[in-house]
Design a protein with these regions (language model features):
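Conserved small/polar residues in nucleotide/adenosyl-binding loops
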Residues: 171-178
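Membrane-embedded alpha-helical segments of multi-pass membrane proteins
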Residues: 66, 70, 114-122, 167
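N-terminal TM1-TM2 helical hairpin plus the immediately adjacent luminal interfacial "cap"
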Residues: 11-90, 103-111, 162-164
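Short, Lys/Arg-rich, polar N-terminal cytosolic tail immediately upstream
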Residues: 1-7
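Hydrophobic transmembrane alpha-helices
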Residues: 76, 80, 123-128
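Divalent metal-coordination and catalytic microenvironments
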Residues: 53, 64, 116, 146, ...
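Aromatic-anchored segments of alpha-helical transmembrane domains
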Residues: 23-26, 96-104, 143-154
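Loop-to-transmembrane alpha-helix initiation sites
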Residues: 137, 161-170
């Protein structure tokens, strides 16, 4: 029992730390009256290259950040709990992969936010659970489908709000597999 609680807490530590960083960045950005959107991705332009690494850290406002907080925490926690041996590698691959693909084939304009990371995590958890045919991971696949199945519609421009970058969401769908 004690080991289970430790494992749960350990899996939560990295997502909580990331979310803490996201909120601290947003608080500093707002408090200092800065606009950090230039740290996002601007496809196929030199000024947007750094955004491949930083785009998930920058959000347009607290509502954008708040909308990403719970899915980012839950999906990251699932990754670090159920895939602890490969979680770090998968997380980094999804982070960089979403940024790189958005940089290469995204629409002109700044792309910011952790939504691409969230979509990549959701698709990895879904497909990895199904492909491994291991009952606990299949259960996670079904839970991810139940909680976040509707996100698939935001991958297409027709169903996405006008200010949402659907490009990054589409490119992370075929997430990296181990």
């Amino acid at each position: 029992m004690k080991q289970d609680i430790q494992r749960i807490m350990l899996a939560a530590a990295k997502p909580l730390f990331l979310i803490f960083i996201l909120y601290m960045l947003k608080i500093v950005e707002v408090g200092m009256h800065w606009d950090l959107s230039h740290l996002g991705i601007y496809p196929m332009e030199k000024r947007g290259v750094f955004g491949i690494l930083t785009h998930p850290l920058i959000h347009s406002g607290f509502s954008h950040l708040l909308a990403n907080t719970l899915p980012l925490f839950f999906l990251s926690w699932c990754l670090f709990y159920f895939y602890r041996g490969i979680a770090g590698k998968i997380f980094i691959l999804i982070w960089i992969g979403a940024g790189l693909l958005t940089f290469i084939i995204g629409k002109p304009g700044w792309h910011i936010g952790a939504s691409g990371l969230i979509y990549g995590l959701a698709f990895f958890l879904f497909f990895s659970g199904i492909l491994r045919k291991y009952v606990p991971l299949i259960a996670i696949s079904l839970l991810v489908t139940f909680l976040y199945g509707g996100i698939i519609w935001h991958m297409f421009p027709y169903f996405s709000p006008a200010n949402m970058s659907w490009d990054c969401l589409l490119y992370t769908s075929p997430s990296p597999r181990d």
